Protein backbone atom coordinates (compact mmCIF):
# COMPACT_ATOMS: atom_id res chain seq x y z
CA UNK A 1 0.00 0.00 0.00
CA UNK A 2 1.30 3.46 -0.91
CA UNK A 3 1.70 6.10 1.77
CA UNK A 4 -0.98 8.18 -0.01
CA UNK A 5 -3.42 5.29 0.29
CA UNK A 6 -2.50 4.71 3.92
CA UNK A 7 -3.03 8.39 4.75
CA UNK A 8 -6.37 8.47 2.92
CA UNK A 9 -7.68 5.52 4.90
CA UNK A 10 -6.49 7.17 8.11
CA UNK A 11 -8.06 10.49 7.10
CA UNK A 12 -11.44 8.85 6.50
CA UNK A 13 -11.61 7.86 10.17
CA UNK A 14 -11.35 11.46 11.40
CA UNK A 15 -12.29 13.76 8.45
CA UNK A 16 -15.64 13.40 6.58
CA UNK A 17 -14.82 11.60 3.34
CA UNK A 18 -11.13 11.89 4.19
CA UNK A 19 -10.85 15.38 2.70
CA UNK A 20 -11.64 18.98 3.62
CA UNK A 21 -13.19 19.86 0.25
CA UNK A 22 -15.24 17.26 -1.69
CA UNK A 23 -13.58 17.44 -5.12
CA UNK A 24 -10.26 16.37 -3.57
CA UNK A 25 -11.68 12.91 -2.82
CA UNK A 26 -11.43 11.84 -6.50
CA UNK A 27 -15.16 10.98 -6.58
CA UNK A 28 -15.30 12.50 -10.05
CA UNK A 29 -12.67 10.13 -11.43
CA UNK A 30 -12.68 7.18 -9.05
CA UNK A 31 -9.81 5.77 -7.06
CA UNK A 32 -8.03 7.41 -4.16
CA UNK A 33 -6.59 10.93 -3.95
CA UNK A 34 -2.90 11.68 -3.98
CA UNK A 35 -1.45 13.23 -0.82
CA UNK A 36 1.19 15.87 -1.53
CA UNK A 37 4.02 17.05 0.67
CA UNK A 38 5.71 19.81 -1.34
CA UNK A 39 5.58 21.99 -4.43
CA UNK A 40 8.17 23.95 -6.36
CA UNK A 41 7.58 25.92 -9.53
CA UNK A 42 5.34 23.91 -11.86
CA UNK A 43 5.79 20.66 -9.93
CA UNK A 44 4.25 18.82 -7.00
CA UNK A 45 5.82 15.97 -5.03
CA UNK A 46 3.60 13.43 -3.30
CA UNK A 47 4.22 11.60 -0.02
CA UNK A 48 5.61 8.64 -1.99
CA UNK A 49 8.21 10.96 -3.59
CA UNK A 50 6.66 10.89 -7.06
CA UNK A 51 6.79 14.18 -8.98
CA UNK A 52 3.97 15.65 -11.10
CA UNK A 53 3.52 18.57 -13.46
CA UNK A 54 0.76 20.50 -11.69
CA UNK A 55 -2.15 21.92 -13.71
CA UNK A 56 -4.36 22.46 -10.66
CA UNK A 57 -2.29 25.13 -8.93
CA UNK A 58 -4.27 24.92 -5.68
CA UNK A 59 -7.39 25.53 -7.85
CA UNK A 60 -6.13 28.81 -9.26
CA UNK A 61 -4.23 30.95 -6.72
CA UNK A 62 -0.71 29.90 -7.67
CA UNK A 63 -0.28 31.88 -10.88
CA UNK A 64 3.45 32.23 -10.08
CA UNK A 65 3.84 28.52 -9.35
CA UNK A 66 4.68 26.93 -6.02
CA UNK A 67 6.97 28.72 -3.56
CA UNK A 68 7.77 31.75 -5.71
CA UNK A 69 10.70 33.51 -3.99
CA UNK A 70 9.04 36.95 -3.95
CA UNK A 71 5.92 35.57 -2.28
CA UNK A 72 7.92 33.51 0.21
CA UNK A 73 10.01 36.56 1.08
CA UNK A 74 6.93 38.75 1.60
CA UNK A 75 5.24 36.18 3.84
CA UNK A 76 8.43 35.53 5.79
CA UNK A 77 8.86 39.24 6.53
CA UNK A 78 5.34 39.47 7.92
CA UNK A 79 5.50 36.14 9.75
CA UNK A 80 8.13 37.45 12.12
CA UNK A 81 6.18 40.64 12.80
CA UNK A 82 2.88 39.02 13.71
CA UNK A 83 0.45 36.76 11.87
CA UNK A 84 -2.77 38.48 12.89
CA UNK A 85 -3.79 41.46 15.02
CA UNK A 86 -7.54 41.70 14.57
CA UNK A 87 -6.90 45.37 13.87
CA UNK A 88 -6.15 47.53 10.81
CA UNK A 89 -2.74 47.30 9.11
CA UNK A 90 -1.04 49.28 6.37
CA UNK A 91 -0.83 46.16 4.20
CA UNK A 92 -4.64 46.14 3.88
CA UNK A 93 -4.55 49.62 2.37
CA UNK A 94 -1.68 48.75 0.04
CA UNK A 95 -3.40 45.66 -1.35
CA UNK A 96 -6.73 47.49 -1.66
CA UNK A 97 -5.08 50.33 -3.58
CA UNK A 98 -3.25 47.87 -5.85
CA UNK A 99 -6.46 46.00 -6.68
CA UNK A 100 -8.38 49.23 -7.33
CA UNK A 101 -5.62 50.48 -9.63
CA UNK A 102 -5.92 47.32 -11.74
CA UNK A 103 -9.73 47.01 -11.77
CA UNK A 104 -11.34 50.37 -12.62
CA UNK A 105 -14.82 49.17 -11.59
CA UNK A 106 -13.60 48.95 -7.99
CA UNK A 107 -13.65 52.23 -6.05
CA UNK A 108 -13.85 50.68 -2.58
CA UNK A 109 -13.06 47.14 -1.45
CA UNK A 110 -13.69 44.96 1.62
CA UNK A 111 -11.35 42.07 2.45
CA UNK A 112 -12.83 38.80 3.70
CA UNK A 113 -11.48 35.27 4.19
CA UNK A 114 -12.84 33.24 1.27
CA UNK A 115 -14.65 33.39 -2.02
CA UNK A 116 -17.78 32.07 -0.33
CA UNK A 117 -17.72 34.98 2.13
CA UNK A 118 -17.21 37.40 -0.74
CA UNK A 119 -20.17 36.22 -2.82
CA UNK A 120 -22.42 35.78 0.21
CA UNK A 121 -21.71 39.35 1.28
CA UNK A 122 -22.09 40.66 -2.27
CA UNK A 123 -25.62 39.24 -2.50
CA UNK A 124 -26.52 40.69 0.91
CA UNK A 125 -25.08 44.06 -0.09
CA UNK A 126 -26.98 44.08 -3.40
CA UNK A 127 -30.24 43.28 -1.62
CA UNK A 128 -29.61 45.95 1.00
CA UNK A 129 -28.67 48.60 -1.54
CA UNK A 130 -31.60 47.95 -3.89
CA UNK A 131 -34.14 46.97 -1.23
CA UNK A 132 -35.11 43.99 -3.41
CA UNK A 133 -35.09 40.26 -2.62
CA UNK A 134 -34.56 38.07 -5.67
CA UNK A 135 -31.40 37.42 -7.64
CA UNK A 136 -30.48 35.53 -10.78
CA UNK A 137 -27.66 33.01 -11.03
CA UNK A 138 -26.74 30.59 -13.80
CA UNK A 139 -26.98 26.81 -13.92
CA UNK A 140 -23.54 25.36 -13.29
CA UNK A 141 -21.96 28.57 -12.02
CA UNK A 142 -20.44 28.05 -8.59
CA UNK A 143 -20.33 30.91 -6.11
CA UNK A 144 -19.24 29.13 -2.96
CA UNK A 145 -21.33 27.13 -0.52
CA UNK A 146 -23.59 29.71 1.13
CA UNK A 147 -27.21 28.54 1.27
CA UNK A 148 -28.89 30.86 -1.22
CA UNK A 149 -26.18 30.35 -3.85
CA UNK A 150 -25.96 26.56 -3.66
CA UNK A 151 -28.75 26.05 -6.20
CA UNK A 152 -27.94 24.32 -9.50
CA UNK A 153 -24.31 25.09 -8.72
CA UNK A 154 -21.17 23.73 -10.33
CA UNK A 155 -17.90 22.51 -8.83
CA UNK A 156 -18.17 19.60 -6.39
CA UNK A 157 -21.94 19.36 -6.75
CA UNK A 158 -21.59 18.39 -10.40
CA UNK A 159 -18.62 16.16 -9.62
CA UNK A 160 -20.67 14.28 -7.02
CA UNK A 161 -23.84 14.34 -9.14
CA UNK A 162 -25.77 16.40 -6.58
CA UNK A 163 -28.22 18.90 -8.17
CA UNK A 164 -28.48 20.83 -4.91
CA UNK A 165 -27.88 19.86 -1.30
CA UNK A 166 -29.90 18.78 1.74
CA UNK A 167 -29.93 21.10 4.72
CA UNK A 168 -31.18 24.19 2.90
CA UNK A 169 -34.87 25.02 3.52
CA UNK A 170 -36.91 25.96 0.47
CA UNK A 171 -37.73 29.27 2.15
CA UNK A 172 -34.07 30.30 1.81
CA UNK A 173 -33.84 29.57 -1.91
CA UNK A 174 -37.28 30.82 -2.99
CA UNK A 175 -35.70 34.11 -4.06
CA UNK A 176 -32.94 32.39 -6.09
CA UNK A 177 -33.77 32.40 -9.81
CA UNK A 178 -31.76 30.39 -12.33
CA UNK A 179 -31.08 30.56 -16.05
CA UNK A 180 -28.76 28.86 -18.53
CA UNK A 181 -25.39 30.48 -19.10
CA UNK A 182 -25.10 32.33 -22.42
CA UNK A 183 -28.92 32.44 -22.68
CA UNK A 184 -29.93 36.10 -22.52
CA UNK A 185 -33.55 35.41 -23.45
CA UNK A 186 -34.12 33.41 -20.26
CA UNK A 187 -32.73 36.27 -18.17
CA UNK A 188 -34.97 38.78 -19.94
CA UNK A 189 -37.99 36.57 -19.21
CA UNK A 190 -37.13 36.47 -15.50
CA UNK A 191 -36.87 40.26 -15.39
CA UNK A 192 -40.23 40.53 -17.16
CA UNK A 193 -41.78 38.18 -14.60
CA UNK A 194 -40.27 39.97 -11.58
CA UNK A 195 -39.64 43.53 -12.83
CA UNK A 196 -39.51 45.16 -9.40
CA UNK A 197 -37.92 42.52 -7.18
CA UNK A 198 -34.63 41.39 -8.75
CA UNK A 199 -31.76 42.89 -6.80
CA UNK A 200 -28.89 41.49 -8.80
CA UNK A 201 -27.54 39.12 -11.42
CA UNK A 202 -24.45 37.19 -10.35
CA UNK A 203 -22.24 35.14 -12.66
CA UNK A 204 -18.77 33.85 -13.28
CA UNK A 205 -17.93 35.81 -16.45
CA UNK A 206 -15.91 32.76 -17.49
CA UNK A 207 -17.34 29.73 -15.68
CA UNK A 208 -14.73 27.30 -14.43
CA UNK A 209 -16.82 24.95 -12.32
CA UNK A 210 -18.98 23.34 -15.01
CA UNK A 211 -16.05 22.74 -17.26
CA UNK A 212 -14.46 25.78 -18.88
CA UNK A 213 -17.00 27.94 -20.70
CA UNK A 214 -16.26 31.08 -22.67
CA UNK A 215 -19.04 33.69 -22.65
CA UNK A 216 -20.66 35.21 -25.69
CA UNK A 217 -19.82 38.92 -25.59
CA UNK A 218 -23.42 39.76 -26.57
CA UNK A 219 -24.58 37.82 -23.51
CA UNK A 220 -22.41 39.87 -21.14
CA UNK A 221 -23.41 43.14 -22.78
CA UNK A 222 -27.05 42.13 -22.61
CA UNK A 223 -26.81 41.40 -18.90
CA UNK A 224 -25.37 44.86 -18.30
CA UNK A 225 -28.21 46.44 -20.28
CA UNK A 226 -30.93 44.43 -18.51
CA UNK A 227 -29.53 45.30 -15.09
CA UNK A 228 -29.49 48.98 -16.02
CA UNK A 229 -33.02 48.78 -17.42
CA UNK A 230 -34.47 47.18 -14.28
CA UNK A 231 -32.29 48.99 -11.72
CA UNK A 232 -30.56 45.78 -10.65
CA UNK A 233 -26.89 45.35 -9.84
CA UNK A 234 -24.52 43.24 -11.93
CA UNK A 235 -22.09 41.12 -9.90
CA UNK A 236 -19.08 39.54 -11.57
CA UNK A 237 -17.77 36.66 -9.48
CA UNK A 238 -14.10 36.91 -10.42
CA UNK A 239 -12.83 34.77 -7.56
CA UNK A 240 -11.39 32.46 -10.21
CA UNK A 241 -10.91 34.77 -13.22
CA UNK A 242 -9.68 37.85 -11.36
CA UNK A 243 -6.00 38.43 -12.29
CA UNK A 244 -6.01 34.93 -13.85
CA UNK A 245 -7.38 35.51 -17.35
CA UNK A 246 -5.86 38.98 -17.64
CA UNK A 247 -4.36 41.80 -15.61
CA UNK A 248 -7.72 43.55 -15.35
CA UNK A 249 -9.79 40.40 -14.93
CA UNK A 250 -12.48 39.12 -17.26
CA UNK A 251 -14.22 42.50 -17.03
CA UNK A 252 -11.16 44.15 -18.52
CA UNK A 253 -10.90 41.64 -21.36
CA UNK A 254 -14.57 41.90 -22.32
CA UNK A 255 -15.03 45.60 -21.59
CA UNK A 256 -17.99 45.10 -19.23
CA UNK A 257 -18.15 47.11 -16.00
CA UNK A 258 -19.95 45.32 -13.15
CA UNK A 259 -21.38 47.10 -10.11
CA UNK A 260 -19.76 44.66 -7.67
CA UNK A 261 -16.81 42.31 -8.19
CA UNK A 262 -15.90 39.40 -5.95
CA UNK A 263 -12.29 38.26 -5.77
CA UNK A 264 -10.19 35.57 -4.08
CA UNK A 265 -7.50 33.04 -4.94
CA UNK A 266 -4.74 35.11 -6.63
CA UNK A 267 -5.21 38.18 -4.41
CA UNK A 268 -4.04 36.00 -1.49
CA UNK A 269 -1.07 34.47 -3.29
CA UNK A 270 -1.95 31.03 -1.91
CA UNK A 271 -3.24 32.19 1.47
CA UNK A 272 -6.96 32.06 2.42
CA UNK A 273 -8.58 35.26 1.18
CA UNK A 274 -11.59 36.85 -0.44
CA UNK A 275 -12.77 40.35 -1.29
CA UNK A 276 -15.66 42.29 -2.74
CA UNK A 277 -15.38 45.68 -4.33
CA UNK A 278 -17.35 48.07 -6.47
CA UNK A 279 -18.85 51.50 -6.83
CA UNK A 280 -18.26 53.85 -3.91
CA UNK A 281 -21.94 54.48 -3.20
CA UNK A 282 -22.69 50.74 -3.13
CA UNK A 283 -19.70 49.71 -1.01
CA UNK A 284 -20.47 52.50 1.46
CA UNK A 285 -23.59 50.53 2.43
CA UNK A 286 -21.32 48.07 4.29
CA UNK A 287 -20.91 48.45 8.05
CA UNK A 288 -19.56 50.38 9.82
CA UNK A 289 -20.16 53.04 7.16
CA UNK A 290 -23.58 51.73 6.24
CA UNK A 291 -26.36 49.41 7.48
CA UNK A 292 -25.38 46.11 5.77
CA UNK A 293 -23.42 44.03 8.27
CA UNK A 294 -20.32 41.95 7.55
CA UNK A 295 -17.39 41.05 9.79
CA UNK A 296 -14.52 38.57 10.11
CA UNK A 297 -11.88 37.77 12.73
CA UNK A 298 -9.10 37.17 10.21
CA UNK A 299 -10.29 39.50 7.44
CA UNK A 300 -7.33 41.39 5.99
CA UNK A 301 -4.82 39.28 7.90
CA UNK A 302 -1.20 40.32 7.21
CA UNK A 303 -0.05 36.99 5.76
CA UNK A 304 -2.68 36.98 3.00
CA UNK A 305 -2.24 40.70 2.32
CA UNK A 306 1.54 40.33 1.96
CA UNK A 307 1.31 37.25 -0.28
CA UNK A 308 -1.35 38.86 -2.45
CA UNK A 309 0.49 42.15 -2.83
CA UNK A 310 3.71 40.36 -3.79
CA UNK A 311 1.80 38.30 -6.38
CA UNK A 312 0.08 41.29 -7.97
CA UNK A 313 3.39 43.14 -8.24
CA UNK A 314 4.80 40.22 -10.23
CA UNK A 315 1.88 39.74 -12.60
CA UNK A 316 1.72 43.42 -13.57
CA UNK A 317 5.21 43.20 -15.07
CA UNK A 318 5.51 43.74 -18.83
CA UNK A 319 4.56 40.74 -21.00
CA UNK A 320 3.53 38.59 -18.02
CA UNK A 321 0.07 37.78 -19.37
CA UNK A 322 1.24 37.57 -22.96
CA UNK A 323 3.72 34.88 -21.94
CA UNK A 324 1.18 33.13 -19.72
CA UNK A 325 -1.45 33.08 -22.47
CA UNK A 326 1.07 31.72 -24.96
CA UNK A 327 1.98 28.90 -22.59
CA UNK A 328 -1.67 28.02 -21.99
CA UNK A 329 -2.42 28.07 -25.72
CA UNK A 330 0.56 25.80 -26.37
CA UNK A 331 -0.78 23.37 -23.79
CA UNK A 332 -4.30 23.16 -25.21
CA UNK A 333 -2.94 22.89 -28.75
CA UNK A 334 -0.63 20.07 -27.64
CA UNK A 335 -3.52 18.18 -26.06
CA UNK A 336 -5.67 18.73 -29.15
CA UNK A 337 -2.88 17.50 -31.42
CA UNK A 338 -2.42 14.36 -29.33
CA UNK A 339 -6.16 13.66 -29.48
CA UNK A 340 -6.30 14.28 -33.22
CA UNK A 341 -3.37 11.93 -33.81
CA UNK A 342 -5.27 9.24 -31.89
CA UNK A 343 -8.50 10.10 -33.77
CA UNK A 344 -10.34 10.85 -30.52
CA UNK A 345 -12.99 13.63 -30.45
CA UNK A 346 -11.71 16.44 -28.26
CA UNK A 347 -12.48 20.06 -27.44
CA UNK A 348 -10.25 22.51 -25.58
CA UNK A 349 -10.34 26.23 -24.86
CA UNK A 350 -8.27 28.68 -22.86
CA UNK A 351 -8.08 32.28 -21.71
CA UNK A 352 -5.06 33.78 -20.01
CA UNK A 353 -3.77 31.18 -17.57
CA UNK A 354 -7.02 29.20 -17.42
CA UNK A 355 -8.12 26.29 -19.62
CA UNK A 356 -10.47 23.37 -19.95
CA UNK A 357 -11.03 20.34 -22.14
CA UNK A 358 -13.49 17.52 -22.66
CA UNK A 359 -13.90 14.56 -24.96
CA UNK A 360 -16.67 15.58 -27.34
CA UNK A 361 -17.28 16.01 -31.06
CA UNK A 362 -18.90 19.42 -30.49
CA UNK A 363 -17.19 22.38 -32.12
CA UNK A 364 -18.09 24.67 -29.22
CA UNK A 365 -18.99 24.28 -25.56
CA UNK A 366 -21.39 26.99 -24.39
CA UNK A 367 -23.08 25.74 -21.22
CA UNK A 368 -23.28 23.04 -18.59
CA UNK A 369 -25.28 20.63 -20.78
CA UNK A 370 -22.57 20.70 -23.47
CA UNK A 371 -19.98 19.59 -20.92
CA UNK A 372 -22.29 17.04 -19.28
CA UNK A 373 -22.90 15.35 -22.64
CA UNK A 374 -19.18 14.75 -23.23
CA UNK A 375 -17.46 11.38 -22.62
CA UNK A 376 -16.95 11.23 -18.86
CA UNK A 377 -15.79 7.62 -18.88
CA UNK A 378 -12.95 8.51 -21.25
CA UNK A 379 -12.07 11.53 -19.13
CA UNK A 380 -11.69 9.33 -16.05
CA UNK A 381 -9.43 6.90 -17.88
CA UNK A 382 -7.38 9.77 -19.31
CA UNK A 383 -7.02 11.41 -15.91
CA UNK A 384 -5.67 8.31 -14.20
CA UNK A 385 -3.37 7.37 -17.07
CA UNK A 386 -1.92 10.90 -17.15
CA UNK A 387 -1.52 10.84 -13.37
CA UNK A 388 0.50 7.65 -13.73
CA UNK A 389 2.68 9.50 -16.26
CA UNK A 390 3.30 12.32 -13.78
CA UNK A 391 0.77 14.88 -15.06
CA UNK A 392 -1.79 16.17 -12.57
CA UNK A 393 -5.00 17.58 -14.04
CA UNK A 394 -8.09 18.51 -12.02
CA UNK A 395 -9.80 15.30 -10.83
CA UNK A 396 -13.14 16.23 -12.39
CA UNK A 397 -14.19 17.06 -15.93
CA UNK A 398 -16.25 19.91 -14.47
CA UNK A 399 -13.23 21.81 -13.14
CA UNK A 400 -10.99 24.22 -15.07
CA UNK A 401 -7.23 23.81 -15.17
CA UNK A 402 -4.55 26.39 -14.52
CA UNK A 403 -1.14 27.24 -15.95
CA UNK A 404 1.46 29.22 -14.01
CA UNK A 405 4.35 31.39 -15.12
CA UNK A 406 6.61 28.45 -14.26
CA UNK A 407 5.12 26.18 -16.93
CA UNK A 408 7.53 26.35 -19.83
CA UNK A 409 8.16 24.52 -23.09
CA UNK A 410 9.72 21.57 -21.24
CA UNK A 411 6.61 20.95 -19.13
CA UNK A 412 4.30 21.31 -22.11
CA UNK A 413 6.41 18.92 -24.19
CA UNK A 414 6.35 16.37 -21.37
CA UNK A 415 2.58 16.77 -21.16
CA UNK A 416 2.20 16.28 -24.91
CA UNK A 417 4.39 13.17 -24.89
CA UNK A 418 2.37 11.70 -22.03
CA UNK A 419 -0.97 12.57 -23.67
CA UNK A 420 0.06 11.05 -27.00
CA UNK A 421 1.11 7.83 -25.28
CA UNK A 422 -2.00 7.65 -23.11
CA UNK A 423 -4.54 8.49 -25.83
CA UNK A 424 -3.07 5.97 -28.25
CA UNK A 425 -3.23 3.32 -25.53
CA UNK A 426 -6.84 4.21 -24.75
CA UNK A 427 -7.74 4.16 -28.44
CA UNK A 428 -6.34 0.67 -28.93
CA UNK A 429 -7.74 -0.71 -25.66
UniProtKB/Swiss-Prot annotation:
<keyword id="KW-0963">Cytoplasm</keyword>
<dbReference type="GO" id="GO:0005737">
    <property type="term" value="C:cytoplasm"/>
</dbReference>
<dbReference type="InterPro" id="IPR015422">
    <property type="entry name" value="PyrdxlP-dep_Trfase_small"/>
</dbReference>
<keyword id="KW-0663">Pyridoxal phosphate</keyword>
<dbReference type="InterPro" id="IPR015421">
    <property type="entry name" value="PyrdxlP-dep_Trfase_major"/>
</dbReference>
<keyword id="KW-0627">Porphyrin biosynthesis</keyword>
<dbReference type="GO" id="GO:0008483">
    <property type="term" value="F:transaminase activity"/>
</dbReference>
<dbReference type="InterPro" id="IPR005814">
    <property type="entry name" value="Aminotrans_3"/>
</dbReference>
<dbReference type="GO" id="GO:0030170">
    <property type="term" value="F:pyridoxal phosphate binding"/>
</dbReference>
<dbReference type="InterPro" id="IPR004639">
    <property type="entry name" value="4pyrrol_synth_GluAld_NH2Trfase"/>
</dbReference>
<comment type="similarity">
    <text>Belongs to the class-III pyridoxal-phosphate-dependent aminotransferase family. HemL subfamily.</text>
</comment>
<dbReference type="GO" id="GO:0006782">
    <property type="term" value="P:protoporphyrinogen IX biosynthetic process"/>
</dbReference>
<dbReference type="InterPro" id="IPR015424">
    <property type="entry name" value="PyrdxlP-dep_Trfase"/>
</dbReference>
<protein>
    <recommendedName>
        <fullName>Glutamate-1-semialdehyde 2,1-aminomutase</fullName>
        <ecNumber>5.4.3.8</ecNumber>
    </recommendedName>
</protein>
<dbReference type="Pfam" id="PF00202">
    <property type="entry name" value="Aminotran_3"/>
</dbReference>
<dbReference type="InterPro" id="IPR049704">
    <property type="entry name" value="Aminotrans_3_PPA_site"/>
</dbReference>
<dbReference type="GO" id="GO:0042286">
    <property type="term" value="F:glutamate-1-semialdehyde 2,1-aminomutase activity"/>
</dbReference>
<comment type="pathway">
    <text>Porphyrin-containing compound metabolism; protoporphyrin-IX biosynthesis; 5-aminolevulinate from L-glutamyl-tRNA(Glu): step 2/2.</text>
</comment>
<feature type="modified residue" description="N6-(pyridoxal phosphate)lysine">
    <location>
        <position position="265"/>
    </location>
</feature>
<keyword id="KW-0413">Isomerase</keyword>
<comment type="subunit">
    <text>Homodimer.</text>
</comment>
Amino acid sequence: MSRSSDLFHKAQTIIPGGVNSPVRAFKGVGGEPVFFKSGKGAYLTDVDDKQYIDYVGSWGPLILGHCHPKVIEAVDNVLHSGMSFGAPTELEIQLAEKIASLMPSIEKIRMVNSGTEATMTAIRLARGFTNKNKFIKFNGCYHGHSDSLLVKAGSGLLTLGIPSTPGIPQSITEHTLTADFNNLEQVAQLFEKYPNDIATVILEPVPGNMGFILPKIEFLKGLRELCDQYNALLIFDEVMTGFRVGLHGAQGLFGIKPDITTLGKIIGGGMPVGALGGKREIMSFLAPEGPVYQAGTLSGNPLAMAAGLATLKEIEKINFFEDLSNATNKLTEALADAAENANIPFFAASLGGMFGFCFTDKNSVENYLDVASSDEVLFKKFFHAMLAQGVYFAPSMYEAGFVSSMHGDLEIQKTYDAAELVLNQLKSA
